[in-house]
């Protein structure tokens, strides 16, 4: 933890994940130590009986500022079926409410698959009703249990990312391993400025139209969209395993070093793997030719999982470089990407 603090200011967000962090008897001591070091502390608990008001109160008292909870369906039937554990939906909803009451910020993480994609509008309703600092849609990386799940096609993913852009006027929205969301945001901003219909211009399909129609039922909201952060594996993000090995992300099993042998700052700043992942000239395939490479870069974790090459093209992106029809307007807008409406 002291090595993370050595990154300096602004202090990195320190997230304790698992498994279930509440399985550690010293979880509160770890949070307290991180807080003493000046780190913003967050915890990602599982929807188990250990997710109680007592444990959340202890987290808050120890210095945690936020938690993240997984919610993949808007009903017990869907969520518990997806997680294969009865009772997780009710425990998660209760924990969400209690965390908010205690003053903890809550991020909701939703895995998007063929079996859960139609839950997205109803999940958004829950996010609006119960309140969350962020709703994060996770696009599958085929590792671990992710290899057993039905991932969306690239065109379906495009429909979902455009729905999430629309949802951004209702709640703070981000993606996990969906880096081409930044491309979609830029495309939509340019089209909106030109008054061009995005459905036709982007060739969006029936999945988008179904999700958008259900979104319209929620009612008009006009909040400022949260600009998507440019964070990717090894670029603004680092994962340290429970045994000390250092990885660009939790979904990329390549180790760049070990905190028991080198400092975390040295590994992040100097290892060939991390340096390579921050160099867009190393990107291959369509990603290497894409005009959006500087703001997107594709999921390096998914590229590695599918091809064995961390610099390979993004498998879930259907975009052909140079195909956006308003390239001049796009070139003018790209420098202002951080100011998305």
Predicted stretch roles:
Residues 1-18, 23-155:
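Radical SAM/AdoMet-radical enzyme domain recognition
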Residues 1-18, 278-279, 313-341:
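Short Fe-S-cluster ligation motifs
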Residues 19, 72, 140, 178, ...:
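Flexible loop residues that form catalytic
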Residues 129, 133, 146-172, 227, ...:
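A structural motif corresponding to the C-terminal lobe/cap of the Radical SAM core domain
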Residues 129, 240-241:
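Short, acidic, Ser/Thr-enriched surface-loop or helix-capping motifs
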Residues 155-224, 245-297:
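C-terminal accessory region of radical SAM enzymes
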Residues 231-235:
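Short, small/polar residue-rich loop motifs at catalytic or cofactor-binding pockets
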Residues 283-327:
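Cysteine-cluster motifs in flexible loop/terminal segments that predominantly coordinate metals
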């Amino acid at each position: 933890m002291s090595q993370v603090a050595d990154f300096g200011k602004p202090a990195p967000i320190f997230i304790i994940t698992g498994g279930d962090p509440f399985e550690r008897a010293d979880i509160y001591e770890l949070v307290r130590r991180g807080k003493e070091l000046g780190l913003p502390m967050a915890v990602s608990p599982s929807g188990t009986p250990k997710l109680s008001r007592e444990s959340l109160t202890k987290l808050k008292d120890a210095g945690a500022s936020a938690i993240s909870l997984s919610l993949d369906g808007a009903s017990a039937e869907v969520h518990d079926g997806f997680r294969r554990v009865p009772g997780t939906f009710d425990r998660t909803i209760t924990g969400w409410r209690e965390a908010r009451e205690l003053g903890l910020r809550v991020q909701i993480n939703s895995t998007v698959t063929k079996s859960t994609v139609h839950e997205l509008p109803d999940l958004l309703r829950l996010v609006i009703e119960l309140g969350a600092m962020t709703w994060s849609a996770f696009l599958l990386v085929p590792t671990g249990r992710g290899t057993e799940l039905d991932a969306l096609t690239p065109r379906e993913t495009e429909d979902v990312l455009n729905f999430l852009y629309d949802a951004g006027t209702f709640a703070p929205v981000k993606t996990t391993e969906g880096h081409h969301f930044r491309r979609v945001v830029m495309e939509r901003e340019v089209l909106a400025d030109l008054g061009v219909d995005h459905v036709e211009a982007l060739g969006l399909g029936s999945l988008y139209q179904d999700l958008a129609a259900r979104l319209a039922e929620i009612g008009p909201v006009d909040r400022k969209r949260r600009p998507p952060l440019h964070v990717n594996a090894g670029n603004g993000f680092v994962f340290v395993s429970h045994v000390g090995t250092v990885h660009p992300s939790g979904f990329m099993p390549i180790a760049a070093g070990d905190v028991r042998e080198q400092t975390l700052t040295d590994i992040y700043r100097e290892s060939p793997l991390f340096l390579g992942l921050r160099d867009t000239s190393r990107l291959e395939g369509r990603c290497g030719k894409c005009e959006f490479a500087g703001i997107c870069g594709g999921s390096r974790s998914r590229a590695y999982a599918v091809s064995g090459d961390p610099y390979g093209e993004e498998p879930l992106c259907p975009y052909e470089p140079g195909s956006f029809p308003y390239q001049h307007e796009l070139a003018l807008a790209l420098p202002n990407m951080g100011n998305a409406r």
